[in-house]
């Protein structure tokens, strides 16, 4: 096997296969290393049928071997099998064969994958039960809010943001919040504006929050409030979104000149991004 390993490392597959052919005549229980080497080589070539065949044969000999489980993890990851990735990563953690950082990376990927496969309220509920609280309130917090909104679970999306935004203050949560609020009743929309306004009291210089409040007020046709929020947002941090919504506010209040001014500012900012000013050359 040492010769086969060395030949494989040198990518001398003819020599490797000659060594492996000799080992092939040994009893099945003595062929574990052969199956592992063939599986690893097949995975590197993305020859998944051969990899699966050898992984299965190796598992019949010793299913708990850490090297085998690592290869199974790699196979599951390549196939996008989130449930199997979680199972194999957990097995390696228990065996002390994988460090915390690597395990966390695999777990984060797997939970994101599971979340992406959710198609309705029932499967979302089942998925959320599997995800650790630390991830739900951390790295996956925004993705969960966005998933609720995309599934049309607007009340759930608003409830999620209400529960998590005060702690995380992730501006990305606000987009899912605003997009979902507009599908709720007028009473619920007003409650959402009041809620977001209460967040603003704690962080009055939060430009994204001001912009999204402006969008909420625009949706409720509260033109004066919308203008105030948007102008405050632009004063702190100009953005294309804030300028465009403010232009629509001016359209609704019969101020076409001011509306055009906002759109001109957008065009100027886009032009600057596409054609930044040339650096001044020294004389």
Regions from the PLM with identified roles:
Residues 16, 51, 85, 123-124, ...:
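Single-residue signature of alpha-solenoid repeat helices
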Residues 60-61, 74-98, 158, 162-171, ...:
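TPR/TPR-like (Sel1-like) alpha-helical repeat modules
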Residues 42, 148, 210-217, 229, ...:
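TPR/Sel1-like alpha-solenoid repeat signature
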Residues 1-2, 27-36, 48-50, 62-70, ...:
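Generic helix N-cap/helix-start motif at coil->alpha-helix transitions
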Residues 4-11, 21-24, 32, 36-40, ...:
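Alpha-helical adaptor scaffolds
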Residues 25, 57-60, 94, 129-133, ...:
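Conserved structural position within tetratricopeptide repeats
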Residues 10-11, 45, 79, 117-118, ...:
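Structural motif corresponding to the intra-repeat A-B loop/turn of tetratricopeptide repeats
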Residues 21, 56, 87-90, 125-129, ...:
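Alpha-solenoid helical repeat scaffolds
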């Amino acid at each position: 096997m040492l010769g086969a390993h060395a030949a494989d490392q040198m990518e001398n597959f003819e020599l490797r296969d000659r060594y492996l052919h000799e080992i092939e005549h040994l009893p099945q229980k003595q062929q574990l290393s052969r199956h592992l080497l063939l599986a690893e080589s097949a995975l590197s070539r993305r020859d998944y049928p051969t990899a699966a065949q050898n992984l299965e044969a190796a598992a019949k000999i010793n299913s708990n071997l850490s090297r085998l489980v690592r290869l199974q993890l790699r196979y599951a990851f390549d196939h996008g099998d989130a449930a199997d990735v979680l199972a194999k990563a957990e097995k390696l953690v228990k065996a002390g064969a994988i460090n915390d950082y690597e395990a966390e990376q695999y777990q984060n990927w797997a939970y994101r994958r599971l979340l992406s496969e959710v198609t309705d309220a029932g499967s979302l509920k089942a998925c959320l039960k599997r995800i650790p609280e630390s991830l739900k309130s951390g790295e996956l917090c925004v993705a969960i809010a966005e998933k609720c909104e995309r599934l049309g679970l607007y009340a759930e999306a608003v409830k999620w943001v209400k529960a998590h935004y005060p702690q995380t203050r992730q501006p990305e949560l606000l987009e899912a919040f605003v997009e979902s609020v507009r599908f709720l009743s007028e009473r619920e929309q007003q409650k959402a504006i009041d809620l977001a306004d209460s967040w603003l009291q704690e962080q009055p210089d939060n430009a994204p929050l001001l912009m999204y409040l402006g969008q909420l007020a625009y949706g409720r046709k509260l033109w004066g409030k919308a203008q105030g929020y948007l102008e405050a947002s632009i004063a702190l941090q100009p953005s294309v979104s804030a300028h465009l919504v403010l232009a629509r506010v001016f359209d609704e209040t019969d101020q076409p000149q001011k509306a055009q001014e906002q759109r001109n500012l957008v065009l100027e900012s886009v032009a600057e991004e596409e054609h930044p000013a040339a650096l001044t050359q020294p004389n």
